[in-house]
């Protein structure tokens, strides 16, 4: 659970990756964010909220030398599959996938949680379109 201190890394320090690094409390949910990786030279060697950003080229070596339980994937979708294969081949147990590509793990022991912002937006659209009585009842249930 939430008190285990699972080791995690974040891959892709673009807008979404930076937002997660700076605003999401991984520790609260039982994850110790150990490192982040990116290809942009201006980011490499810097740190966000105490998490150092490493060159993406060093990821295989990092994975070989460190136990990583989970990875947060924020890379461009063109790199999603190859990055997932790299992670799973190095024994990463779980991937929190923000790439907008529906990923499945080549390793049956790896869990992939695909996050699709469009699903959340569709849910909102559905809720907005319900008539007022249904909306009021749903709001009462959801806001308890």
Language-model segment annotations:
Residues 1-7:
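HTH-adjacent hinge/linker in prokaryotic transcriptional regulators
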């Amino acid at each position: 659970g939430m008190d285990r201190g699972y080791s995690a890394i974040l891959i892709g320090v673009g807008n979404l990756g930076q937002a997660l690094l700076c605003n999401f409390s991984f520790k609260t949910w039982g994850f110790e964010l150990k490192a982040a990786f990116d290809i942009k030279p201006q980011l490499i060697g810097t740190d966000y909220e105490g998490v150092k950003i490493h060159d993406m080229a060093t990821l295989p070596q990092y994975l070989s030398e460190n136990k990583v339980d989970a990875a947060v994937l924020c890379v461009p979708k063109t790199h999603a599959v190859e990055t997932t294969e790299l992670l799973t081949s190095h024994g990463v147990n779980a991937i929190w996938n923000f790439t907008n590509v529906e990923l499945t793990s080549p390793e049956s022991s790896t869990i992939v949680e695909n996050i699709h912002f469009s699903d959340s937006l569709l849910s909102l659209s559905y809720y907005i379109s319900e008539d007022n009585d249904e909306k009021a009842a749903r709001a009462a249930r959801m806001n308890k």
